[in-house]
Regions:
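A glycine- and charged-residue-rich anion-binding loop/surface
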Residues: 60, 84-98, 109-110, 402-405, ...
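Short Gly/Ser/Thr- and Asp/Glu-enriched loop/turn motifs at secondary-structure junctions
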Residues: 166, 462, 589-593
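Hard-cation-handling environments
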Residues: 245-375, 379-428, 432-548, 552-564, ...
Length: 600
C-alpha cells in the first residue's frame, strides 16, 4: 500500500486529467486510515534503532557450559547456566563453569534466569551463580524439580524463588516478553524461548530435535514456531550439536525396539543398563520392558536414585507397585528376574558402573551371568573412559553391549534436515549457530546459507562476544569478560593454569624433595641433605642415582657458602638447577624439585 501512495502523485502530475478520471482513487489515497498509520511507521523506525545485545558466556566452540545473556533498554535476562566436565588435561578438576564476572557486575539489571531444560550442561552451574547473588529461576515443572534437588545439596533451595512456566505462557521480564515453546529432546519438559523485545524477536531453540512419534509430550510445536516466522524473527540461535549429520535424528521409539530384542537375548541373565540419570524417557522405557519381562527393577547411582524419585513424585515416571526394589535386594532374586538401571554411561570414575567394573561396588558383583547394556554414546572426550569400563566388565566375564552394536541409543539433538526445518519455519533475518564446537557451528552456518540466508547475516560468535542486533544491522561490540572457572572439591576458581601445569608436571615425572638444615649465619650444612622421591623412581632400585643426587646438592650448597650467597631464594634456585641438570643427564626426565632449607 505504501508503494501505491508514493507512485500516485507522479502519475497525477503526468496526466492532468487523471484526478477527474479517477476521483475514487484520489479519495482512497487521502483516506484517514492511511495517514493514521504514518505515526506508527515512524514509531516502528524508532524501535528498529533500539539494539539488543547478546552475550554468550559459554556453549560456543564447546559442548557444554551453556549460558547466554540478553540486554535491551537496560534490562537483562539470562538463558541457561550449565557446566562442562573437565578434559583429561585438567588433573583433579571436578567440573568447569562459566566466569560470572560480567553478570555479577550487572546483577542489578538482571530480571531472571530462564532454563530451557534440566541437563547438567544447562543447569549445572546454577548453585555457583546463586552463591554470588539471588535471582528468580524460570523453568518447566521437571526442570525446576531437578534444579531444586541440586540446590538442596548447597543449602540454597529454601531461599531461591522458582517460577514454574508452561509452553505458550508468556512471561514479562522488564522490556522482554518471553514465550516458552515446547520442543522434543531426550528429557521431558524441554522448551525453546521466543524472546520479544523493542529490538525484535529472537528465538533460542535450546537443545531440540523433531520427533514425529515421541514417547510423550507431543511433537515439537512447529505451529508456534511458524507463527513467529510469519510475524518476523530478528534472529535465531539454534542447536548445532548434530550439524554434521545428514538426515533426521531417529525417534526414541527405535530404542524401545532395540532394547526389547536385547531383553529377549538376555533371557536367563541379569540385565544391567547404564544410561543418563536425566533421560527420564529412556528409564521409563526400560521399566516398561522389565515389567513386560516379569523382572524387578533397581536403581544404582545417587543421581539416578534422586532423579527417578523426583520424576515419580511429579508424575513424569510411572513404576507399577511391587516392581521397584532396592539395590540391596538384588541378590534375593534369581538373575533372570531383575534389571539394574545405573549411572556411568560416560565412564565417570566414581559412577556406579565404574565401581562395578573395578569390583569396588559394595552391593553389585559383576560376573559371567550379567548382560550389560550401555544405552548412550560417549560424549566427545569420554571415549577412553568408556572403553576402560567396557574392558573391565568384559574381563569379569560379562557380556557388554555398547555404542553402535545395537539400537540402544538415539540422539536428543536435531540433524541437518531438522535444522533446515527450524530455519525454514522461523525465517530469521539473522542467524547465530550455538551449542557446539567450531566445526559444528561452521557446518550449521553453511546449512543456513544454503537456504538463502545472506552470509552477511550469519555470525559465528565466540564466548565473550558482544553481538549487537537491530533491524538494520548485526555487528560486534566490545567483548566482555569470559572464561572457564574450574571447580575442585569445595574450591571454586582457585585452580588456575599454574596449578594445572604443576599437576601435569607431577603426573608425568614425579617429585623430588630436598631437606637440609643450615646455619643461618654461615650457611653451612648442619644436617642432611636428605632426598625424598615420590612418583619419580623407586629409591631402592636406584640407589646410585640418589647417592649421586645427594652429592650434587651438597656441592651446590658448599659453593653457595664459598661465594657468600645468603639469600635463601637464590640458594634454593641454585640447588634446584644443579639437581635438575644432573637428573636430566642421567634419566632424560624432569621431576618437580622442591628444596626445603631449615635455618638454625
Amino acid at each position: 500500500m505504501a508503494q501505491v501512495k508514493e507512485q500516485n502523485p507522479a502519475q497525477a502530475q503526468n496526466n492532468p486529467n487523471r484526478n477527474s478520471e479517477s476521483g475514487g482513487e484520489k479519495r482512497t489515497r487521502t483516506r484517514r486510515p492511511y495517514y493514521n498509520r504514518r505515526p506508527r511507521r515512524t514509531q516502528q523506525s524508532k524501535e528498529a534503532a533500539v539494539p539488543i545485545h547478546i552475550y554468550p558466556l559459554g556453549g560456543l566452540g564447546e559442548v557444554g557450559k551453556n549460558m547466554t545473556v540478553y540486554e535491551c533498554n537496560g534490562d537483562m535476562i539470562i538463558v541457561d547456566c550449565g557446566l562442562v566436565f573437565p578434559d583429561s588435561e585438567m588433573y583433579g578438576v571436578d567440573m568447569v563453569i562459566p566466569d560470572f564476572t560480567f553478570v555479577v557486575q550487572n546483577k542489578d539489571k538482571i530480571k531472571g534466569l530462564l532454563i530451557t531444560h534440566g541437563h547438567e550442561d544447562h543447569i549445572g552451574s546454577i548453585p555457583y551463580l546463586l552463591q554470588k547473588f539471588d535471582l528468580p529461576i524460570y523453568g518447566t515443572r521437571l526442570t525446576c524439580g531437578l534444579i531444586r534437588n541440586k540446590l538442596e545439596e548447597f543449602g540454597l533451595a529454601g531461599k531461591t524463588k522458582f517460577v514454574e512456566i508452561t509452553p505458550k505462557q508468556k512471561i514479562k521480564l522488564g522490556c522482554f516478553t518471553v514465550e516458552p515453546i515446547h520442543v522434543n529432546h531426550s528429557i521431558p519438559d524441554s522448551v525453546a524461548f521466543a524472546i520479544d523485545s523493542p529490538a525484535g524477536t529472537i528465538i533460542q531453540t535450546g537443545d531440540f530435535k523433531i520427533d514425529y512419534t515421541p514417547l510423550a509430550c507431543g511433537v515439537t510445536d512447529l505451529t508456534t514456531l511458524s507463527e513467529y516466522g510469519q510475524k518476523g524473527v530478528l534472529a535465531l540461535l539454534s542447536d548445532s550439536t548434530n550439524a554434521e549429520r545428514p538426515g533426521f535424528t531417529a525417534t526414541e521409539q527405535k530404542v524401545a525396539a532395540g532394547v526389547r530384542n536385547l531383553f529377549a537375548r538376555a533371557r536367563n541373565k541379569r540385565i544391567i543398563i547404564a544410561t543418563f540419570a536425566s533421560n527420564i524417557y529412556r528409564v521409563q522405557q526400560i521399566i516398561d520392558l522389565a515389567v513386560e519381562d516379569g523382572r524387578k527393577v533397581a536403581f544404582s547411582g545417587r543421581s539416578m536414585v534422586n532423579n527417578t524419585a523426583m520424576a515419580q513424585e511429579l508424575g513424569y515416571m510411572h513404576i507399577p507397585e511391587g516392581t521397584l526394589i532396592s539395590v540391596d535386594e538384588l541378590n534375593q532374586y534369581p538373575p533372570e528376574q531383575v534389571v539394574l538401571i545405573t549411572t556411568g554411561s560416560q565412564g565417570e570414575p566414581l559412577s556406579a558402573l565404574s565401581r562395578m567394573a573395578s569390583c569396588s561396588h559394595r552391593q553389585v558383583r559383576v560376573g559371567p551371568g550379567d548382560f550389560i547394556i550401555i544405552s548412550a554414546n560417549p560424549i566427545p572426550g569420554n571415549e577412553k573412559s568408556v572403553t576402560k569400563i567396557v574392558n573391565g566388565l568384559l574381563l569379569l566375564g560379562a557380556e557388554v553391549i555398547y555404542e553402535s552394536m545395537y539400537d540402544v541409543h538415539v540422539s536428543g539433538h536435531a540433524c541437518q534436515e531438522e535444522q533446515k526445518l527450524m530455519l525454514t519455519l522461523t525465517r530469521p533475518k539473522y542467524f547465530l549457530p550455538v551449542h557446539g564446537e567450531y566445526k559444528q557451528l561452521k557446518k550449521h552456518a553453511l546449512t543456513a546459507a544454503s537456504l538463502g540466508i545472506p552470509t552477511s547475516n550469519i555470525l559465528i560468535a565466540e564466548n565473550g562476544s558482544n553481538v549487537i542486533l537491530s533491524r538494520d544491522e548485526i555487528k560486534l561490540g566490545e567483548p566482555v569478560t569470559v572464561g572457564a572457572v574450574m571447580v575442585d572439591g569445595l574450591g571454586v576458581g582457585d585452580v588456575g593454569n599454574v596449578v594445572l601445569r604443576d599437576r601435569k608436571h607431577l603426573s608425568e615425572d614425579g617429585l623430588v624433595i630436598i631437606v637440609a638444615t643450615v646455619d643461618s649465619k654461615t650457611g653451612k650444612v648442619l644436617a642432611g641433605p636428605d632426598l625424598v622421591s615420590r612418583g619419580f623412581v623407586y629409591v631402592r632400585e636406584n640407589e646410585s642415582l640418589m647417592d649421586g643426587a645427594q652429592s650434587i646438592v651438597e656441592n651446590a650448597l658448599d659453593r653457595c657458602v664459598e661465594e657468600h650467597v645468603r639469600d635463601w631464594n637464590s640458594v634454593k634456585t641454585r640447588v634446584r638447577e644443579a639437581l635438575s641438570s644432573y637428573i636430566y643427564r642421567r634419566t632424560k626426565r624432569s621431576p618437580m624439585i622442591l628444596p626445603i632449607l631449615m635455618e638454625v
